[in-house]
Amino acid sequence: MDFPQHSQHVLEQLNQQRQLGLLCDCTFVVDGVHFKAHKAVLAACSEYFKMLFVDQKDVVHLDISNAAGLGQVLEFMYTAKLSLSPENVDDVLAVATFLQMQDIITACHALKSLAEPATSPGGNAEALATEGGDKRAKEEKVATSTLSRLEQAGRSTPIGPSRDLKEERGGQAQSAASGAEQTEKADAPREPPPVELKPDPTSGMAAAEAEAALSESSEQEMEVEPARKGEEEQKEQEEQEEEGAGPAEVKEEGSQLENGEAPEENENEESAGTDSGQELGSEARGLRSGTYGDRTESKAYGSVIHKCEDCGKEFTHTGNFKRHIRIHTGEKPFSCRECSKAFSDPAACKAHEKTHSPLKPYGCEECGKSYRLISLLNLHKKRHSGEARYRCEDCGKLFTTSGNLKRHQLVHSGEKPYQCDYCGRSFSDPTSKMRHLETHDTDKEHKCPHCDKKFNQVGNLKAHLKIHIADGPLKCRECGKQFTTSGNLKRHLRIHSGEKPYVCIHCQRQFADPGALQRHVRIHTGEKPCQCVMCGKAFTQASSLIAHVRQHTGEKPYVCERCGKRFVQSSQLANHIRHHDNIRPHKCSVCSKAFVNVGDLSKHIIIHTGEKPYLCDKCGRGFNRVDNLRSHVKTVHQGKAGIKILEPEEGSEVSVVTVDDMVTLATEALAATAVTQLTVVPVGAAVTADETEVLKAEISKAVKQVQEEDPNTHILYACDSCGDKFLDANSLAQHVRIHTAQALVMFQTDADFYQQYGPGGTWPAGQVLQAGELVFRPRDGAEGQPALAETSPTAPECPPPAE
């Protein structure tokens, strides 16, 4: 059973998805206008896209600079309808020839032939016979015949994505034949009448005949000499790219680029286009044979295929073919004006010249910001002149294009739409993602001549080379450090200025970098967005997840070239190399011992300060090294405990409160109360968990008094016997029971009687304190043996101590 309308229904659904932006995996950006599409549809309709997507490039620059023509071609792909007019036929033809869509090319040529001016008012054969009139008449006849055939063939309902070429012109539709008979005055061009063309897929012969006739009559060649063309195209493309109004960019949805004012960020895609996108299979159409001179002769797009006799590759663009030939001949006609290095391609030569002096000579008089191109400066000046009409609602910043505004809004939302397919790490801009992909790609062909660092993309190498430029535009004036982007330099300058513009909404702590703020906020929210797909363990940072995943896979991609040792992270390799070179820039101010990295120095300083910042969250014991804490957790708690790292806020005062201090404070606090007697019992007697709770309550009281005197005091709880410090009273109270001679503070309040245990105390002879028993005495202080209680009184509730 056949369903003739099924293919038409599928095409309609795809068009609706395109209009709504659903399931689109490709985006064109032309003149700031975004066109979404499906790669499968593009490849089905265009030989160019079919070959292009085989290479799977994320971003490709196309020689398409008019949004109107591209919009018409996309509309044709999804609806099989094309609105042609004398005003837009050139734009549509330019796009169609570049994308190798022969049906549209044929129709555009036919329409242009009908629109050519007549040489005489009568328009008869005799007048046409003069000055090439016979040739023009023949072309007109073929074009009219072609349009008529296509119209007749299209009267049957097309099945599948057949081409409907439709020209709408406000008035009543007329046939192509009647339009061909109309004539006008000699001084006015004769325009074609409005027609509706519906070519059937079976009308290929008519299209082929028309193509052959029209290609022979082509009077205008669409190419220039490759040397001049390459340089001019490269310059024009750069200017238009960075102004946001340049050649179309074809992008996969996962790595979409907004056009706009970030030339430093987008320079790595300037040379992304390759010849491979314009190569065709041998079955595409017949080859035109001839000598080398014939094959290099400039022809219109799609009118001839050039085949390399050495390797068999085919090209429709003469300029691409000439550049390819230089691979075999070894010819390098383009040389760098600074170092005379030779190149076979003008774009590569131009990119190389930028590495010598990527300065920005065009400066803004208003704010001093500089640009490499005058066109970018003019675009920037729109901000000051009030032409920047796109305003951010969050911070009020103005932008000249909507694309720049959208990219800026990601800063406020924290959204990172560009995700790495290998490790899941997300990025707010595609350039950062592309640079991150360097860590996964082992095939790095582009090598830095200064430091031997390698890259898999020439754009990333170009960005890296800025580091080696003496007195370059991205050099910190304070410390001389070089950066690849102005954004990185701006963040670095905050280190010297002390500026911290990013504030945590939970604790008001300030940060110089938005990424640091984002990681800090996760401490409050408990968010761990980076989850391991193998074991389910979650992490707050993507870098931690990457290192963790490599533990599963055993991957150690970073190799020391000197000893062959491999590492999970690049920072580990960098530290390892410093050991080889004996570079120890971090020196201890107390003993002058030097260390390779600042982390080792921080661990060493703890020896001098006696600090134990690594705390076991199970028992509260502190350690001066994290490896000692891990060993403790493993042996004492069988691995069922966590780790706390004590990091006091900057500028806060740290007050160490010992057990002896707490006893004194508690005694002084109770001096005015009705305390009858304090009895001291050796710890050798039974000490219960209930008594420990009593101790915690009294410690809390003492801490409360300290905090009332100075609310900003940060309190650590220290053990008198071993010096261990704890974050809270509970941890200290649990720890106290480890030492046999340690004191427990217990005292009497208005309602209950408590005791203080101490090493120097005595106990009435014959009196044994059993577990769960407390000593009660009369409030009037009457002498006698203490009475025993079956249960312990409940400890008074106190506010929790500050951590």
UniProtKB/Swiss-Prot annotation:
Positions with biased composition (Basic and acidic residues): 132-142
Biased composition (Low complexity): 171-180, 206-217
Cross-link Glycyl lysine isopeptide (Lys-Gly) (interchain with G-Cter in ubiquitin), where in sequence: 397, 481
InterPro entries the UniProt entry points to: BTB/POZ_dom, SKP1/BTB/POZ_sf, Znf_C2H2_sf, Znf_C2H2_type
MF (Gene Ontology): core promoter sequence-specific DNA binding; DNA-binding transcription activator activity, RNA polymerase II-specific; DNA-binding transcription factor activity; DNA-binding transcription factor binding; DNA-binding transcription repressor activity, RNA polymerase II-specific; RNA polymerase II cis-regulatory region sequence-specific DNA binding; transcription coactivator binding; zinc ion binding
Entry's Gene Ontology cellular component terms: nucleoplasm; protein-containing complex; protein-DNA complex
SUPFAM superfamilies: beta-beta-alpha zinc fingers (SSF57667), POZ domain (SSF54695)
Principal location listed in the UniProt entry: nucleus
Zn finger limits (C2H2-type): 306-328, 334-356, 362-384, 390-412, 418-440, 446-468, 474-496, 502-524, 530-552, 558-580, 586-608, 614-637, 717-739
Region of interest (Interaction with HCFC1), residue spans: 637-803
Compositional bias of kind Acidic residues: 233-244, 261-272
GO BP term, pick one: ectoderm development
UniProt note on tissues of expression: Expressed in germinal center B-cells.
Keyword set, alphabetical order: Developmental protein, DNA-binding, Isopeptide bond, Metal-binding, Nucleus, Phosphoprotein, Repeat, Transcription, Transcription regulation, Ubl conjugation, Zinc, Zinc-finger
Start and end residues of each stretch annotated as Disordered: 116-295, 779-803
Pfam families with a match to the protein in the record: BTB, zf-C2H2, zf-C2H2_4
Region entry Interaction with MYC, spans: 269-308, 637-718
Sequence ranges assigned to domain BTB in this UniProt record: 1-104
Keyword Signal: no
Post-translational modification: Undergoes 'Lys-48'-linked polyubiquitination at Lys-397 and Lys-481 and subsequent proteasomal degradation in a TRAF2-dependent manner.
Family designation: Belongs to the krueppel C2H2-type zinc-finger protein family.
Record-linked PANTHER family: ZINC FINGER AND BTB DOMAIN CONTAINING 17 (PTHR24394:SF52), ZINC FINGER PROTEIN (PTHR24394)
Name this protein carries in UniProt: Zinc finger and BTB domain-containing protein 17
